[in-house]
Amino acid sequence: MKQQDNPLIEQFLDALWLERNLAENTLASYRLDLHALVGWLTHHNSDLLRASPQDLQSFLAERIEGGYKATSSARLLSAMRRLFQYLYREKLREDDPTALLSSPKLPQRLPKDLSEAQVDALLNSPNVDIPLELRDKAMLEVLYATGLRVSELVGLTISDVSLRQGVVRVIGKGNKERLVPLGEEAVYWIENYMEHGRPWLVNGASLDVLFPSNRSQQMTRQTFWHRIKHYAILAGIDSERLSPHVLRHAFATHLLNHGADLRVVQMLLGHSDLSTTQIYTHVATERLRQLHQQHHPRA
């Protein structure tokens, strides 16, 4: 049997997709990790149904010593835990050998953020007299006003947006729905774009996508990322400060800087775990520390 056809792994991934609705990229990464585990176990005269905690710890240690990054090691451990929990739950094993495995220590990475002045410069970069750039202006305004993920933004339909109520309906990770306020500025630019930009882009086509590409199709995340980089150059923003989610990060950090409650920011971002949102408090605290050092006479 070919290694990539391991039936236990495929059964597990099918169940995981049905239960958790994980992204295809995550499932593909899990598949690679788990096939590597099966290969290692086979080489050591074992398999998924007989592997011991010591086997799994040795496999994980070899991966880390071989240059696996902490993030990759954490993903590998997550895949292993979920697999063996599944095997135990399905009564294919009498135990869960991952129960006592130790997690690799992850360094805390602060999100790249922009100052409010940099965000203003970025948002003012598109030439709104050009329909394509008017669309981009509306997209940037919506992104900063709502903190949406880029994938959520490019997937918006006309029916997802209520300009009268000033809210957007978002289907996030795990098909979870949330309503996010737009704010007056974003509403204004969507209205402007709907009247003067979108008709030119769709060119008479029947299309429900709110922000189509210039070929009357749904825009890809990669295309919009290139647009962000283009406007960042015009705004004089260092590319080192950029990421596809740079305005999502700015949205969260600036809200916290202005006193927003952490749980409200969590709800707006669509985070299921508060700890995911808490990293933005470190960005805000770091900014305060820098300002203190710059301006306090005894800093």
Swiss-Prot record:
SUPFAM superfamilies given in the database record: DNA breaking-rejoining enzymes, lambda integrase-like, N-terminal domain
Active-site residues, Swiss-Prot/TrEMBL: R149, K173, H245, R248, H271, Y280 (o-(3'-phospho-dna)-tyrosine intermediate)
Pfam families referenced in this protein's UniProt entry, alphabetically: Phage_int_SAM_1, Phage_integrase
GO cellular component: cytoplasm; Holliday junction resolvase complex
Domain Core-binding (CB) residue range list: 3-88
Domain Tyr recombinase: 109-293
Segments crossing the lipid bilayer: none
Regulation: FtsK may regulate the catalytic switch between XerC and XerD in the heterotetrameric complex during the two steps of the recombination process.
GO biological process, one term: cell division
Localization of this protein: Cytoplasm
Stored PROSITE patterns: CB, TYR_RECOMBINASE
Keyword field contains ATP-binding: no
Keyword set, alphabetical order: Cell cycle, Cell division, Chromosome partition, Cytoplasm, DNA integration, DNA recombination, DNA-binding
Gene3D superfamilies the record matches: 1.10.150.130, Intergrase catalytic core (1.10.443.10)
Domain of life: Bacteria
GO MF, any single term: tyrosine-based site-specific recombinase activity
Family named by the database record: Belongs to the 'phage' integrase family. XerD subfamily.
Record text on subunit structure and interactions: Forms a cyclic heterotetrameric complex composed of two molecules of XerC and two molecules of XerD, in which XerC interacts with XerD via its C-terminal region, XerD interacts with XerC via its C-terminal region and so on.
The protein's role, per its UniProt record: Site-specific tyrosine recombinase, which acts by catalyzing the cutting and rejoining of the recombining DNA molecules. Binds cooperatively to specific DNA consensus sequences that are separated from XerC binding sites by a short central region, forming the heterotetrameric XerC-XerD complex that recombines DNA substrates. The complex is essential to convert dimers of the bacterial chromosome into monomers to permit their segregation at cell division. It also contributes to the segregational stability of plasmids. In the complex XerD specifically exchanges the bottom DNA strands.
PANTHER family reported in the protein's UniProt record: PHAGE INTEGRASE-RELATED, TYROSINE RECOMBINASE XERD
Protein's UniProt name: Tyrosine recombinase XerD
Originating organism: Yersinia pestis
